[in-house]
Amino acid sequence: MLVYLAEYLTQFYSGFNVFSYVTFRAILGLMTALMFSLWWGPKMIERLQLLQIGQVVRNDGPESHFSKRGTPTMGGLLILAGIFISVLLWGDLGSRYVWVVLFVLASFGTIGFIDDYRKVVRKDTKGLIARWKYLLQSIAAIVIAVYLYASADTAGETQLVVPFFKDVMPQLGAFFIVLVYFTIVGSSNAVNLTDGLDGLAIMPTVMVAAAFALIAYLSGHVQFANYLHIPYLPGAGELVIVCTAIVGAGLGFLWFNTYPAQVFMGDVGSLALGAALGAIAVLVRQEILLVIMGGVFVMETVSVILQVGSYKLRGQRIFRMAPIHHHYELKGWPEPRVIVRFWIISLFLVLLGLATLKLR
């Protein structure tokens, strides 16, 4: 929004031209989201406490989690508000890239909000019925997939980039819609499964978003894109603003979510952030890279799939409890140890993912 005002004011004072630079607006976007989260966080936590919107803890979970009962949840609203305010202020609202991610955040955030509302306000422990949740996620993802396929202007927008291989970018055709669907829905649910310990999901989300900010910047510049053998995507640079807003809002939320947490993000946050990462990966054509950099999310999801599959087929469990972070808790690891070690793994995987841009 302010980019248009700055463009107008440039004719009176050339110094306003600095707002035309994506990097400058990205820094302001990060700072805006961070400062808003730090400012509004205490007020929101107090409000959630007054409304008695507290976390529901499963009785069959680790005993150390019983003390978390009643901790305010639905803090994802804080994250989403910070992102939206920052992007609307500093982003180019004429960019379809920006609106795609905002739509994903809003739609999946709404699904998560309904789920949280049923759990913590209406005291329905099951929340939104799984099939309805999946149906709503599917509708939102398909809408985005069809829109991106129909509006693609260049061949690079529907190619699949394969890490480690130079110029291996097969044209997907209609299969692009399928890939977009599974990337967004899968990423959304993967982050949701990871969000089981204080700060466990938000920090890897911040790391992956920061990495995608760099990738979006490189993809939006023809020289960098050609040098790194990745698709050149005109206008993709505006995604840098979105990514840095996620980083800022995420770090601001982590201030209150770090162990012992004062607030949890709830499904309204985890489903929305996961879907946003999936959408950004799709927009910069780096779905496989998301699997690498978001390896912690993948590990958590696979542990659940293996646990359920093993129990149904063999009647035996592989892990003491799934997702896998609970397995380590039941082995006796203190919660902070599990969290920080998963953060370290996430950092390593993000750096590995970035390294693939050059290792081709």
Swiss-Prot record:
Role summary: Catalyzes the initial step of the lipid cycle reactions in the biosynthesis of the cell wall peptidoglycan: transfers peptidoglycan precursor phospho-MurNAc-pentapeptide from UDP-MurNAc-pentapeptide onto the lipid carrier undecaprenyl phosphate, yielding undecaprenyl-pyrophosphoryl-MurNAc-pentapeptide, known as lipid I.
Q: Which InterPro entries match?
A: Glycosyl_transferase_4 (IPR000715), PNAcMuramoyl-5peptid_Trfase (IPR003524), PNAcMuramoyl-5peptid_Trfase_CS (IPR018480)
Instruction: Give the protein family.
Output: Belongs to the glycosyltransferase 4 family. MraY subfamily.
* Pfam family of the protein (one): Glycos_transf_4
Q: What Gene Ontology molecular function terms does this protein carry?
A: metal ion binding; phospho-N-acetylmuramoyl-pentapeptide-transferase activity; UDP-N-acetylmuramoyl-L-alanyl-D-glutamyl-meso-2,6-diaminopimelyl-D-alanyl-D-alanine:undecaprenyl-phosphate transferase activity
The UniProt record lists the keyword Kinase: no
Gene that this polypeptide is encoded by: mraY
| Record EC number | 2.7.8.13
Stretches that traverse the bilayer: 21-41, 74-94, 97-117, 135-155, 168-188, 199-219, 236-256, 263-283, 288-308, 338-358
Q: What UniProt keywords are attached to this protein's entry? A: Cell cycle, Cell division, Cell inner membrane, Cell membrane, Cell shape, Cell wall biogenesis/degradation, Magnesium, Membrane, Metal-binding, Peptidoglycan synthesis, Transferase, Transmembrane, Transmembrane helix
Membrane topology term reads: Multi-pass membrane protein
What is the name attached to this protein's record?
Phospho-N-acetylmuramoyl-pentapeptide-transferase
Q: Which domain of life is it from?
A: Bacteria
NCBIfam families per the record? mraY
BP terms from Gene Ontology: cell division; cell wall organization; peptidoglycan biosynthetic process; regulation of cell shape
Question: Which compartments does it reside in?
Answer: Cell inner membrane
Catalyses which reaction?
A: UDP-N-acetyl-alpha-D-muramoyl-L-alanyl-gamma-D-glutamyl-meso-2,6-diaminopimeloyl-D-alanyl-D-alanine + di-trans,octa-cis-undecaprenyl phosphate = di-trans,octa-cis-undecaprenyl diphospho-N-acetyl-alpha-D-muramoyl-L-alanyl-D-glutamyl-meso-2,6-diaminopimeloyl-D-alanyl-D-alanine + UMP
Pathway(s) where this gene product acts: Cell wall biogenesis; peptidoglycan biosynthesis
Gene Ontology CC annotation, any one: plasma membrane
Q: What is its main location?
A: membrane
Q: Which cofactor does it need?
A: Mg(2+)
HAMAP family in alphabetical order: MraY
